[in-house]
Amino acid sequence: HVDSVDSSAKAMALVDKNVEIGGFDKSRHTSLCVDALDYLRDVPEDKYDLMIVDPPAFAKHRGALNNALRAYQRLNAAAISKVAPGGFVFTFSCSQVVTKEAFALAVFSAAAQTGRKVRILDRLNQPSDHAVNIYHPEGEYLKGLLLYVE
């Protein structure tokens, strides 16, 4: 079963349309228009085998960086705690001012907070169609981690 969670009703309508277009069994999919962190608070631990955490940009300027890193930590701690042993978390950031290193540290802190053993299986970067101009390194804003949760 797939649960799709987003605070945007428009996004959830598009998800539902794509489920229909793809010919997927609608009984095996639930769309929930709710804040992801609020949703995760009520989900039983070990519910999911796989979770994709892909929030909107939490920091659009340097002044928002510390709050963004705390938000990434809270969201990832909630996600890691809801994944069953042997499960996976794909987690992403599209915040330009959040470096790969700072994002990874927020995720590491989240894992430590949960007390779960977590391994990085892969570091994910933006694809080649999001080329980075050498004179604008901040253009390398998409980053992610594939985590294995023991």
Residue ranges and their predicted role:
Residues 10-12, 38-40, 59-61, 97-100, ...:
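Flexible loop/turn segments at secondary-structure boundaries
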Residues 47, 74, 88-150:
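C-terminal catalytic and target-recognition region of SAM-dependent MTase-like enzymes
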Residues 37-41, 73, 77-80:
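Amphipathic, non-transmembrane alpha-helical secondary structure
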Residues 8-52, 58:
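S-adenosyl-L-methionine
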Residues 44, 64, 71, 102-103:
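Residues at alpha-helix caps and immediate loop-helix transition turns in enzyme cores, especially N-
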Residues 49-78:
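Mobile active-site "lid"/loop adjacent to the S-adenosyl-L-methionine
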Residues 83-85:
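Helix-to-beta-strand junctions that scaffold the AdoMet/dcAdoMet cofactor pocket
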Residues 1-6:
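Conserved SAM-binding motif I beta-strand of class I
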